[in-house]
Swiss-Prot record:
Keywords: Antibiotic, Antimicrobial, Defensin, Disulfide bond, Secreted, Signal. The gene is Defa20. Pfam families: Defensin_propep. GO terms for cellular component: extracellular space. PANTHER family: ALPHA-DEFENSIN 1, ALPHA-DEFENSIN 1-RELATED. It comes from the Eukaryota. Residues 25-40 have a biased composition (Acidic residues). One of its GO terms (biological process) is killing by host of symbiont cells. Residues 22-57 are annotated as: Disordered. It is found in: Secreted. The lineage of its organism: Eukaryota, Metazoa, Chordata, Craniata, Vertebrata. Belongs to the alpha-defensin family. Residues 1-19 form the signal peptide. This is Alpha-defensin 20. Residues 20-58 form a propeptide.
Length: 95
């Protein structure tokens, strides 16, 4: 079941990468930081809506951000956003 969750995350990431427009070479050489480019929030959830054991144990919600430079403590790189930003995710804490 953990494999299914991982594959789902990879498929979601692949769709996101394909949905991003291809950057022009002029944009890639521009090094000025654009407002709102850093720390764009994305929420990703996996699991059975009926609250199965899979949802409770192995597919906790992820909180993801597109970050410039590197992921914060507790986050892992899951890919890229728009080619230049890192797609960083961490597990949401459950109470």
């Amino acid at each position: 079941m953990k494999t299914l969750v991982l594959l789902s995350a990879l498929v979601l990431l692949a769709f996101q990468v394909q949905a991003d427009p291809i950057q022009n070479t002029d944009e890639e050489t521009n090094t000025e930081e654009q407002p709102g480019e850093e720390d764009q929030a994305v929420s990703v959830s996996f699991g059975d809506p009926e609250g199965s054991a899979l949802h409770e144990k192995s597919s906790r919600d992820l909180i993801c951000y597109c970050r410039k430079g590197g992921c914060n403590r507790g986050e892992q790189v899951y890919g890229t956003c728009s080619g230049r930003l890192l797609f960083c995710c961490r597990r949401r804490h459950r109470h």
